[in-house]
Amino acid sequence: MKLDLLTAISPIDGRYRGKTDVLAAYFSEFALIKYRVQVEVEYFITLCELPLPQLKGVDKGVFETLRNIYRNFSEADAQRIKDIESVTNHDVKAVEYFLKEEFDKLGGMDDYKEFIHFGLTSQDINNTSVPLSVKEALEQVCLLYTSDAADD
């Protein structure tokens, strides 16, 4: 079935899509994947900043480049992750493999890419990504609407 008003999983994505479209940036499949990428990248950076002994050699100048992976995250990136997932049958593992590909593009990160997702479970990623999406939706959308309503 193609997605339309009659085949949407809920009225939120169906008849109310015009009113809730702004929330797609926080709660869509694309958004969840992007938040997972963000959490994995920030976790890796945190391991470098500790520093985890094996990551002492990571140049801190690469941190902004790593953050740009999620800041500039595209539909093509999300599709690449979905393609990886079709092989792995594991959504979070697909994010990890995607990030390893991105590290390969940077060069000089071969010794460090095995520390992506180091010591984490998929639930660690999901249980951080979903609340982050809720937090950002509240701050960037919901509070603005309630503030506007209070002003009226």
Write out the residue ranges for each language-model feature.
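A short, hydrophobic C-terminal helix/tail in secreted or cell-surface proteins
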Residues: 148-152
